[in-house]
Amino acid sequence: MRDGGLMKISRALPRMSWHPKNLYNLFLRTVDSKNDHRRAITFGDNSIRSLFQERWVSKTVVRAYHGDHINEKIFKQWYLPDYLPDVRPRRKVFGDDKASLQEFAKRRQREKALEEEEQTKGLAPIGSLMFAEVERRLDVLIFRSCFAPSVYEARRLVVHGNVLLNGKRHYNANTRLAPGDMFSVKPSAMRILQPQREKGESDNVIDHPDAPPELTPFNLPFYASPWLFIPAYLEVSFATCSAIYVRHPTARPQYSEVPTPYGADGEVIRHAWEWYMQNRPRKRTESQWSKMPDDRLRRQMEELRLGRNSLKLATSGI
């Protein structure tokens, strides 16, 4: 771990980790404590904080979980989206000549039923999509695939050359993957697949003396079950220790694919978004674009654009 104070209970900041202290910190942040105003995140009339303090606290707790190992300046410049998608229903206005045809075809009734269903379900929680670019990072995807007990361990696996990206050894943990990319982790480098050193290190304390010696050991850390889930945008194969980044995370009514310990469209995420909208870089120069972290999707788009330009030049010369 790069910093011993990451899991301090006095700070109570949830991280991307399976550590037991991290689960307790998550409990302290998600359960409202009336006696501890420093840990409880309250808004509105019952809050003792100003609007600036509410936004600052929201930004702090949100960034502690979503990419705390990313420099704040780099996060605001390259990982923060320019805007969030608009999910408000678009009302259609038709002329008098089309109204009679729609009533005849019963399209208006179907549209009304869809609008009522949309109002019942509510709008999609898009607030958590502000961290969609962070979810594309290779180290974060390794943690989401449950191949590493923390995002810091996942970063160590990449830096030490234990990860293959599309069949080639990859050392850059900052790489953002494109849909269709496949990454694999070396099983011998995964700590959960190593022999148990001490009796109290794992929940897997049942001995099987009759088991063949060639079976791979599996030692699950204590209190890891709340973090064992796979997002919908990943296709994971535990038999081969590999996964495919299928598509970008999205959201639909009452569901967001970006995992977060806070409400996907709650006040914490909203206040954090308001903070970044007021404190973000205004533009990117050519020199700044050259310093951008590795993005495979942007690289593929540039290669496609160059291929189209070369094709146009080749056809124009014929």
Regions found by a protein language model. Give the residues of each.
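Short, well-ordered loop/turn sites that connect or cap secondary structure elements
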Residues: 151, 157-158, 163, 177
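Contiguous, well-ordered alpha-helical segments that form the cores/surfaces of helical PPI scaffolds
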Residues: 139-144, 156, 160-162
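Active-site metal-coordination segments of metallo-dependent hydrolases
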Residues: 151, 170-173
